[in-house]
Amino acid sequence: MPYFVVINEQGPAWDEKRSMRDQRGWDEHAVFMEALADEHFVVLGGPLKYLEHRAMLVLNAPNEVALQKRLAEDPWMRTGVLRTLEIYPWEILLGKLT
């Protein structure tokens, strides 16, 4: 199955006064993302250190449409706390993900 790199950023409902884990709906978002990781849909993911309020995901999906449909189910996506900025198909040439 192909890999994709997804860059997400804060959405219009992001509260600048709160940390990431204090955002509204954090617990539901975290449970959702952990389930995707358990299913191996999310291969790797986390915040980008020097790009405030952005995160990168490496996803294992059959195509971009399926990927977008699945990410749209994220509670943070549904409520506007998070939004997808960029999606790139990714080919691994060095190393391997196991």
Regions found by a protein language model. Give the residues of each.
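Conserved, structured core segments of small domains
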Residues: 1-98
